[in-house]
Each structure stands twice: as C-alpha cells, then as structure tokens.
C-alpha cells in the first residue's frame, strides 16, 4: 500500500527503487545471466546497442506491472522472454560467430579447390591427344612409302604409326587388328613372301604400282575411289598357253569343276560334236572369265565312212582275187556300211537284243542238211555278191547272222557259217526274228573303220586292174 500511495510524488525514483528491488529479489539469477550474455555478445564483436536496449526495456517493464498489482509475474515474464530468446540466441550468436569464421575459411576452401583444379586442367597431356584425320589405308601407305625398300611387315607398319602419332602410341594394342584387316582386304596392298635366306616372321606388304593415284593430289586426307586390281591380258595369255601345252590330261583338266574331274568345256568337247563343243567352250568362257581354255578332246576323231556304192564296187572288183573267207568278210562289211547309212537316216539308236535262237540246235537233220547243202554253202560266197541261187541265199543268211553279232565275233561267225552251212528252210526260220530287230549304230563305226582298213590293205597288195 505504501508503494502505491507514494507513486505520484516521485515516479522516477520509485521506478528506479522498484526496479532495483525487483531485480534483486524476484529475478535473482537472471540479471547475472543477462550480464554474462552481454559480455559474451561483446566478446563476439557484436554491437552493444541492442543489449542495452533490452536492459532498458527490462528496467521499464516493472512499473507498468506495478500499477496493475497482481499481474507482476506476467510483467516479469516479458523480460524473461526477452532475455530468454537472448539466452537462447546467445549461443547461436556465438556459434554464428564461429560459423562465420568457418564460413570464411570454408568459402576460402572451395575457392582454393577450384583454383587448384583450374590449375591442374591444362597440365593433363592425355586430353590434348587428338585422333589423326587419316584412314588406316592412308597410314599404311605412309609407312610403306617412307621405307627404303618400299615394303614393310605388319610389325614395321605398326611401329611407324606409333612413332609418328602419339594418339596411336597410347592405344597401341587396339588398332593392330584394324591394320591387319585393311592389309588383307584391300587390293592396293600386295603381299610379298619372305625370302628363304631372310630370317624373321611375317610376310612383307607393298603397294600395287597401279594404285599410285589412289589419293587426290597426293594428299592422304581424301581418297578418290576404292582400288580394284585387274588381271593383265598378257599374263592370262601366257598362262593359257602354258596350260594348253600339257594336253588333254593336264593338271587344269584334273582339277576342274567337271563331273569327272574335267573342266566343263573339256568335258563337253570330249564327247560331243565339234560345234557343240565350241558352243560349250564359249558358254564356259562367259561364265568363268578367268578359267583356262578348253583342252583337246580325249577321244580321236572318227574315221569317215565310205559310201556303200563305192564299197560294193571295190568288193566286186577284188572278189575274184580273194579267198572265200575274205570275200565273206568284205561282203559282210559292205552290208554293214549300207545298213549304217540306212540306220543313220532313220535315226535308230536302240541296242541289239540277245538272240538265243541264232545258233541251230544240234540234231541229225542239221547234220544231214549240212552235208547236202555243202556245195551250196561253197557257192554262197560268190552267190552273196551276185544275189541269186539257194546257196547264195544261205551264204547271205550266214553273212546277216555274222553281222548281227558284235564286231569282235564277226570272223568267228564267218568261219562258222563257212564250215557249218544251214538249210534254206532252217536258216529262214532262224534269221527271220533276228532281221526284225532294228539295227543300232553302236558297232557300225568300228566296223566301217575295219572295212576301210581291209580295203586299203587289199588295194596295196593287189592293185585294181
């Protein structure tokens, strides 16, 4: 009550007294804490103005609460809240001071780090290596042209590229296979075998003489076109002449692509007409432009056949001077020539069937008939040329029988027909089914050749009169 009554006389003095008492009594440890916080704030080099204002506000706070009386704890709570945040923010401010120093040092740290990285970037040599703008073909060409002998091995080419370009020196094992592939797949590079007296490993590689203008104006940066090697004409002619000198059984014919180890043109020309062989050779030359020329045919050309009229005239002229067996053979060959002309015109190519009933069966009638027909058989040699009489018919039948047999048994059939003549009825019945069989030209050509040879021998021995 005394405090409220004396408040009007001396407000300022009462306020100061109340403030001191309140601070000394009610807030015992907070004043000291505030001072300590002030000292700590001053130690952090913070401005002293805001803490002084806070203390003044704390000093001015209690008179307002004193007039209300019971609201002193609430009035005292305001400075405590004001000082409370001060207490709470004191440590962060101190920490902030330290954090500021750390921020300064930390800021200097990244700056120094960036400066260090900026200083190390131009010192790295690997980033400055750039791949040369040359292709592998250009690099190989450079290596070969700079060598004294104008040829290098694969290892020599790789060594030149590594010494000349640092980029390839750093990546040496990766591009060696690329060099090897370009050497083997491009026609502008030619492989040269190593000499026997030159020790070492690997073949030499050189440039094709025709690939000198492969690059534009001598610059290795640009290539005109892909080089393709063309085989020279004179080399092919020399190879053809050399292989043709081996004959029909040459190595080329044995290693050809024909069905039986022959070249297609040789296989076609060996067993066909000359025109067909020429056509086949032309087709093979078009299909295989680098193939060897066809070799000579394996079989010799056939002997030309004599006309049947001329052969019959010569046989009639020499018939009187020859023996019976030779006359029978000449007559048989004349009939063969005539039959050959007929068969060639008709174009029959069927084979001769076997004749099991060609030979007569052994019986008494055949023996009796042979004894009675012996004179007719002897006259059959001349009768076959004249073409009349029973004996002549029998002789003609024997000749036909001997002709229908293979050419190897012509002489044996002729002798059998001479020593064992047949009767007219028996011969006709036996030969009738044989004559109905169409003739084949399989054995006509050898028979004609034998006829021509026999005629030449007879003419040389007995000249025509």
From Swiss-Prot:
Keyword 4Fe-4S: no
Keyword terms of this UniProt record: Activator, Developmental protein, DNA-binding, Nucleus, Repressor, Transcription, Transcription regulation
GO BP annotations listed: cellular response to leukemia inhibitory factor; DNA-templated transcription; embryonic placenta development; in utero embryonic development; negative regulation of transcription by RNA polymerase II; positive regulation of transcription by RNA polymerase II; trophectodermal cell differentiation
Region (Disordered): 1-127, 375-405
Annotation: DNA-binding region: 130-221
InterPro entries in the record: FH_FOXD3, Fork_head_dom, FOX_domain-containing, TF_fork_head_CS_1, TF_fork_head_CS_2, WH-like_DNA-bd_sf, WH_DNA-bd_sf
Described purpose of this protein according to its UniProt entry: Binds to the consensus sequence 5'-A[AT]T[AG]TTTGTTT-3' and acts as a transcriptional repressor. Also acts as a transcriptional activator. Negatively regulates transcription of transcriptional repressor Rhit/Zfp13. Promotes development of neural crest cells from neural tube progenitors. Restricts neural progenitor cells to the neural crest lineage while suppressing interneuron differentiation. Required for maintenance of pluripotent cells in the pre-implantation and peri-implantation stages of embryogenesis.
Protein's name in the database: Forkhead box protein D3
Listed PROSITE patterns: FORK_HEAD_1 (PS00657), FORK_HEAD_2 (PS00658), FORK_HEAD_3 (PS50039)
Stretches with biased composition (Gly residues): 105-118, 377-400
Biased composition (Polar residues): 1-18
Keyword Cytoplasm tagged: no
Tissue: Expressed in premigratory and migrating neural crest cells in the early embryo and in motorneuron and interneuron progenitors in the developing spinal cord.
Annotated localization: Nucleus
MF GO annotations: DNA-binding transcription factor activity; transcription cis-regulatory region binding
Cellular compartments per GO CC: nucleus; transcription regulator complex
Annotated Gene3D superfamilies: Winged helix-like DNA-binding domain superfamily/Winged helix DNA-binding domain
SUPFAM superfamilies xrefs: Winged helix' DNA-binding domain
Organism the protein comes from: Mus musculus
Comp. bias regions, Acidic residues: 21-39
Subunit structure: Interacts with POU5F1.
């Amino acid at each position: 009550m005394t405090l409220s009554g004396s408040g009007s006389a001396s407000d300022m003095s009462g306020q100061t007294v109340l403030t001191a008492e309140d601070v000394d009594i009610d807030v015992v440890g907070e004043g000291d804490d505030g001072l300590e916080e002030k000292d700590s704030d001053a130690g952090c080099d913070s401005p002293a103005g805001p803490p002084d204002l806070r203390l003044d506000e704390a000093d001015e706070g209690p008179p307002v609460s004193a007039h209300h009386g019971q609201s002193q704890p609430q009035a005292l709570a305001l400075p405590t809240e004001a000082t409370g945040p001060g207490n709470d923010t004191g440590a962060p401010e101190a920490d902030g001071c330290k954090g500021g120093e750390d921020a300064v040092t930390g800021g200097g740290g990244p700056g120094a780090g960036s400066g260090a990285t900026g200083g190390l970037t131009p010192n790295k040599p690997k980033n400055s290596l750039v791949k040369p703008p040359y292709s592998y073909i250009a690099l190989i060409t450079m290596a070969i042209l700079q060598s004294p002998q104008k040829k290098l091995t694969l290892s020599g080419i790789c060594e030149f590229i590594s010494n000349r370009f640092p980029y390839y020196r750093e990546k040496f094992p990766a591009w060696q296979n690329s060099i090897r592939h370009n050497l083997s797949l491009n026609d502008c590079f030619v492989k040269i075998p190593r000499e026997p007296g030159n020790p070492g490993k690997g073949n030499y590689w050189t440039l094709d003489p025709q690939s000198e203008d492969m690059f534009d104006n001598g610059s290795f940066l640009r290539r005109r076109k892909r080089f393709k090697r063309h085989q020279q004409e004179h080399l092919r002619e020399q190879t053809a002449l050399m292989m043709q000198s081996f004959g029909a059984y040459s190595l080329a014919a044995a290693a050809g692509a024909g069905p039986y180890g022959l070249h297609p043109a040789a296989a076609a020309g060996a067993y066909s007409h000359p025109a067909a062989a020429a056509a086949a050779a032309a087709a093979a030359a078009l299909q295989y432009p680098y193939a060897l020329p066809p070799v000579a045919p394996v079989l010799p050309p056939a002997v030309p056949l004599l006309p049947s009229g001329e052969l019959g005239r010569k046989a009639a002229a020499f018939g009187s001077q020859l023996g019976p067996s030779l006359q029978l053979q000449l007559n048989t060959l004349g009939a063969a020539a005539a039959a050959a002309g007929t068969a060639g015109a008709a174009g029959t190519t069927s084979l001769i069937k076997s004749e099991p009933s060609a030979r007569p069966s052994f019986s008494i009638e055949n023996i009796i008939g042979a004894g009675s027909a012996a004179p007719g058989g002897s006259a059959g040699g001349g009768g076959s040329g004249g073409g009349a009489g029973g004996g002549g018919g029998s002789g003609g039948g024997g000749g036909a029988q001997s002709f229908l047999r293979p050419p190897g048994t012509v002489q044996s059939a002729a002798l059998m027909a001479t020593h064992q003549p047949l009767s007219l009825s028996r011969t006709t019945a036996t030969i009738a089914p044989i004559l109905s069989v169409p003739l084949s030209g399989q054995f006509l050509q050898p028979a004609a050749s034998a006829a021509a040879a026999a005629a030449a021998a007879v003419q040389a021995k007995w000249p025509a009169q």
